[in-house]
Amino acid sequence: MNKVITILFFCLFAETGFSQNANPYSNTDKGQVYILWGWNRAYYTKSNISFKGDDYNFELAKVKAHDRPTAFSYHNYLKIDRITIPQTNFRMGYFIKKDLALTLGFDHMKYVMDQDQTVKMTGNIDRNGSYKGSYNGDKVLTEDFLTFEHTDGLNYINVEVEKYMKIYQSENNKFIVQGLAGGGIGFMMPRTDAKLLDYERNDEFHVAGFGVNSKIGLQLTFFKH
């Protein structure tokens, strides 16, 4: 599955010391920290999803899915008690040396399986009912057969290393352009909301896998604080 395009973010840098000298201002010195909060859109490649229980064992191949962005409003995006409702990104970073930061991040996305799509299904269902049987062919994912989503969070918790490279800095230090590149590892902890046949709905948090990620970006700093 592919993710994530960050479309807007707020970033706050904090300095750990102060001195009066002629050296240019830097927001990436050793010991500095930052906090980032933003929102994202996510796009997913096709996935293979396996289901296994006491009386079923099957796989769905090349399943299509989409994200579910929350409609923009002050209530949904800026009220403090609603900040985890939209698809969000949160990150804290600490500069372990100049221009090199170690960060901890939380990416909250949403994953919704496309309903009524046709996929390849292989396996068997032994539960009595209209879907009992062996499968090795096309299957339409109707709502009475399966609904599957991570709308309470397809959550990616990760650590990253980021390298910053200064491109331009104005003489008054009020405008800085920096490139950045980074990579990290993490694990997926979604809350899956799934309903299969007439089984009870499942909606528990669980560790669902691990991931690696990389990024490149451009950072614009408009003020020193």
Tell where the protein language model's regions lie, with residue ranges.
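Noncatalytic linker/hinge segments flanking ATPase motor cores
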Residues: 75-80, 131-134, 217-224
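Extracytoplasmic loops and strand-loop junctions of Gram-negative outer membrane beta-barrel proteins
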Residues: 69-77, 139-147, 196-202
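Gram-negative (and chloroplast) outer-membrane scaffold detector with strong preference
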Residues: 26-31, 91-194
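Outer-membrane beta-barrel transmembrane domain signature
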Residues: 48-66, 149-152, 162-225
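Short glycine/proline- and aromatic-enriched beta-strand/turn motifs that initiate or cap beta-hairpins
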Residues: 20-94
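Short sequence motifs at beta-strands and strand-loop junctions characteristic
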Residues: 27-29, 76, 80-86, 149-156, ...
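Bacterial Sec-dependent N-terminal signal peptides
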Residues: 1-25
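Intrinsically disordered, low-complexity Ser/Thr/Pro-rich tracts
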Residues: 2-4, 92, 213-219
